[in-house]
């Protein structure tokens, strides 16, 4: 306001503090008022002077006299924009004054929570700033920080615009929580209410990414042309489902599948090793969460190692044919060939043999060895030799003499050797009866005889004589029964005869004794 209008106001204030003679006083109603910015208010200025006096309202605001009486005037103030101190004055002998405090309130024009970081590490403090433009009276204006509906902290709004900061210790529970600012204009003590304005909420994302790097599980060496698998794992990641995992070989990213479980993740890639990858390559895994990442890498060596080339000059030969066995491998690979002395490690090995029947189905093997990144690798190749030879029948495989007991189960074992396998038949001399070979059956006396066993194949035939003896017993059961009966009857007859004879002897002796006794009784006594 200009300096000149303020001087009378000061003088009026002093006059009010020092009442004039006569005791007349100036009063105002209301003594204080609070209105919404841009609003209007009516002020009644009156005086206790009972004489005609001059009185009025000292203000720079737009005022209108509404009505008046002998010692009072009602003014209306309009479009009030800011706090003001008004003075009613009257001049009755002396000038007296009465002040009025006019408070303007208005709501903040802007309440905003400053942008939050896209990701915030758990365990670190985060400073949030609430920006408030406008709003009065500031002594009754408070800024509140909210998490959802929960009040975290409040501070007074200071400055224009006001920037109020809050420090929050961020935890896992704050992940995806909504934060906002609210202003509280508390005018309840002035007969009004509590006026609140809120900002738009902002969502916070928190994360945990351990300092330890991810773990790579991969074979250290891989053969080109084969499928290989690589795993990348990391524990203690929160929220694990938001983490990005990159697997790459050299500069080429690998297609991977990521599985999440609680605070752990597992990325798996199945890759085919290409020939152009041969050599040592860097395999790396990178886990990114928020604005941080962790990376680990391993060396993988890709190698080419074809199996050794094992050849036979002829895989199938006639007996006593010379066969060349040869094994060969690429440069840098050493081979060892069965049939050669051990300890000869060369890239190419061969030898010759004069094939015999004992070499039929003989297996030859070649072993190739290659060292890759400190690992000794080995591959084997085998070939089988087939030797063609005529039939063989010898004592070991076809015994020339067999003795069997009639009724027992026996098997005639007679095996012929040869390549191709010969057909074997045994016919008995005389009647050309066929002898079963290799079957378990009861022995009969009819199979006894001399047989000619003949083995035949496209490469020849051979014959061997086989004698079969059968031990058997005649059927003397009836004779045995008769003899046994006669022996029994004879024994019984002899026993009966001896018994009767003994009985007659005893009877005879008894009779003689009785006669002797009788004669002794009948003889007269001799006179003395």
Swiss-Prot record:
InterPro entries: ICAM, ICAM1_3_5_D2, ICAM_N, ICAM_VCAM, ICAM_VCAM_N, Ig-like_dom_sf, Ig-like_fold, Ig_sub
Family stated for the protein in its record: Belongs to the immunoglobulin superfamily. ICAM family.
Extent of motif Cell attachment site: 147-149
Subunit field text: Homodimer. Interacts with MUC1 and promotes cell aggregation in epithelial cells. Interacts with ARHGEF26/SGEF. Interacts (on T cell side) with CD81, CD247 and CD9 at immunological synapses between antigen-presenting cells and T cells.
Protein name according to UniProt: Intercellular adhesion molecule 1
Keywords of this entry: Cell adhesion, Disulfide bond, Glycoprotein, Immunoglobulin domain, Membrane, Phosphoprotein, Repeat, Signal, Transmembrane, Transmembrane helix, Ubl conjugation
Compartment(s) where it occurs, according to its Swiss-Prot or TrEMBL record: Membrane
SS bond list: 45-88, 49-92, 130-181, 232-285, 327-366, 398-414, 414-453, 426-453
GO biological process terms on file: cell adhesion; cell-cell adhesion
Cytoplasmic compartment segments: 500-528
Residues with the Phosphothreonine modification: 526
Residues spanning the membrane: 477-499
Gene from which this protein is expressed: ICAM1
PTM statement from Swiss-Prot or TrEMBL: Monoubiquitinated, which is promoted by MARCH9 and leads to endocytosis.
GO molecular function: integrin binding
Signal peptide limits: 1-24
Domain Ig-like C2-type as annotated: residue spans: 38-99, 123-188, 225-292, 320-373, 407-460
Protein source organism: Canis lupus familiaris
Main location: membrane
Keyword Membrane: yes
Bilayer topology term: Single-pass type I membrane protein
Ranges per topology, Extracellular: 25-476
Cross-referenced Pfam families: ICAM1_3_5_D2, ICAM_N
């Amino acid at each position: 306001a200009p300096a000149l209008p303020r001087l009378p106001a000061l003088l009026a204030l002093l006059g009010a503090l020092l009442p004039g003679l006569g005791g007349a006083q100036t009063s105002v109603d209301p003594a204080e008022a609070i209105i919404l910015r841009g609003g209007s208010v009516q002020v009644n200025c009156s005086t206790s002077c009972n004489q005609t006096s001059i009185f009025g309202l000292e203000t720079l605001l737009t005022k209108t006299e509404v009505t008046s009486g002998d010692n009072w005037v009602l003014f209306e103030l309009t479009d009030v924009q800011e706090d003001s101190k008004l003075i009613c004055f009257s001049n009755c002998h002396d000038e007296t004054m009465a002040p009025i405090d006019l408070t303007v309130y208005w709501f903040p024009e802007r309440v905003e929570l400053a942008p939050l970081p896209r990701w915030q590490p758990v365990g670190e403090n985060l400073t949030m700033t609430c920006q408030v433009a406008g709003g009065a009276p500031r002594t009754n204006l408070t800024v509140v920080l909210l998490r959802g509906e929960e009040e975290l902290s409040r501070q007074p709004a200071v400055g224009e615009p006001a920037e109020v900061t809050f420090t929050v210790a961020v935890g896992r529970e704050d992940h995806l929580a909504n934060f906002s600012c609210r202003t509280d204009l508390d005018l309840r003590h002035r007969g009004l209410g509590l006026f609140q304005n809120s900002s738009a909420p902002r969502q916070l994302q928190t994360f945990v990414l351990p300092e330890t790097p991810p773990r790579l599980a991969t074979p250290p060496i891989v053969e080109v042309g084969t499928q290989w698998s690589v795993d990348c794992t990391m524990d203690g990641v929160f929220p694990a489902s938001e983490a990005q995992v990159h697997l790459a070989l050299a500069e080429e990213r690998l297609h991977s599948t990521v599985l999440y479980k609680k605070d752990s993740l597992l990325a798996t890639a199945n890759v085919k090793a290409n020939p152009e990858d041969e050599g040592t390559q860097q395999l790396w895994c990178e886990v990114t969460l928020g604005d941080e990442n962790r990376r680990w890498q391993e060396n993988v060596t890709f190698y080419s190692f074809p199996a050794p080339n094992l050849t036979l000059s002829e895989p199938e030969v006639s007996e006593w044919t010379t066969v060349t066995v040869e094994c060969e491998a690429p440069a840098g690979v050493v081979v060892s060939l069965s049939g050669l002395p051990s300890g000869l490690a060369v890239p190419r090995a061969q030898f010759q043999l004069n094939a015999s029947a004992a070499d039929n189905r003989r297996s030859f093997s070649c072993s190739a060895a290659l060292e890759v990144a400190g690992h000794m690798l080995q591959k084997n190749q085998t070939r089988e030799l087939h030797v063609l030879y005529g039939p063989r029948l010898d004592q070991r495989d076809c015994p020339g003499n067999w003795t069997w007991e009639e009724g027992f189960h026996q098997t005639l074992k007679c095996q012929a050797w040869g390549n191709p396998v010969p057909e074997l038949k045994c016919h008995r001399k005389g009647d050309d009866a066929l002898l079963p070979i290799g079957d378990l059956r009861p022995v009969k006396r009819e199979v006894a005889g001399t047989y000619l066993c003949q083995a035949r194949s496209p490469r020849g035939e051979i014959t061997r004589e086989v004698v079969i003896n059968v031990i058997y017993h005649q059927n003397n059961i009836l004779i045995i029964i008769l003899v046994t009966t006669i022996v029994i009857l004879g024994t019984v007859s002899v026993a009966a005869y001896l018994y009767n004879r003994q009985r007659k002897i005893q009877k005879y002796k008894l009779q003689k004794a009785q006669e002797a006794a009788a004669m002794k009784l009948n003889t007269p006594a001799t006179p003395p």
